């Protein structure tokens, strides 16, 4: 929602450097869900497993990701935080062999670890 994705991506790049395989897409006020879906579709590759990070589970971006998961090999992680994005970008450049499901779990766990009280 809004510029949250751009802000998270910029913050992540301050820490881990440029991330060529990461793109932020903004759902701006007045933008229709259909327009957002078309924008997301233009960057998805049906041959590449992709993670879509969204801010709120059940919000328009996560609902669109769910719909697109029927057509593309994508997984959606809702409730994104900076730690998750940093971990995802660091793992992209890693030589560590792991399945897509293991990659998703690793990112999820990294995000949870950074939530402390």
Task: Tell where the protein language model's regions lie, with residue ranges.
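N-terminal loops that bind phosphate or other acidic moieties
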Residues: 1-117
């Amino acid at each position: 929602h809004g510029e949250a994705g751009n802000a998270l991506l910029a913050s992540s790049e301050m820490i881990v450097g440029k991330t060529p395989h990461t793109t932020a897409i903004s759902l701006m006020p007045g933008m229709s869900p259909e327009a957002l879906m078309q924008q997301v579709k233009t960057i998805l590759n049906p041959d590449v497993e992709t993670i879509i990070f969204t801010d709120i589970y059940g919000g328009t971006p996560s609902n669109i990701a769910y719909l697109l998961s029927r057509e593309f090999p994508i997984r959606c992680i809702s409730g994104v935080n900076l730690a998750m994005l940093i971990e995802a970008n660091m793992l992209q450049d890693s030589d560590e062999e792991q399945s897509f499901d293991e990659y998703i779990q690793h990112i999820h766990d990294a995000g949870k670890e950074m939530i402390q009280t």
